[in-house]
Amino acid sequence: MIKIKTFLLLFFFTAFSTTGVYSQAKKFPSPPSADAIKNPLKGDGTSTTAGKLIYVKYCVTCHGDKGKGDGIAAPGLPKRPADHTSSFVQSQTDGALYWIISAGNNPMPTYKKTLTPTQRWQVVNYIRTLANTSKK
């Protein structure tokens, strides 16, 4: 009887102690220093509108028109594009999002030379609005 209780105790302890590992989101692939980068356009509605135009031109193909990572190119990619409406992406700092847009994240290309710093911040501001529209 003691062996059965010990087995059950170990089984449940192991099962429940490792469950959190699988449910935790992966770390965003930006360096910790990216969190300190401050958004100079935060809360600017004009920049959000400009960001949407840039997003449509450069991001929709992979991330989809609502930012869910379901664009027309997504099925052919080696890993699914980020869902910009997700709590995981929305919980990242503006600096981390800016860093990813700038540096890229394979297979996502870098936009450091394609977009100006202002344009990259505009995209960050637009991504922030996607959480509010994800249920529509």
What are these regions (language model features)?
Residues 1-8:
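Bacterial N-terminal signal peptides that target proteins for export
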Residues 99-102, 106, 112-136:
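C-terminal capping alpha-helices of c-type cytochrome domains
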Residues 18-23:
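Sec/Tat signal peptide C-region and signal peptidase I cleavage site
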Residues 41-42, 48, 68-96:
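Gly/Gly-Pro-rich "capping" loops immediately C-terminal to redox-active cysteine motifs
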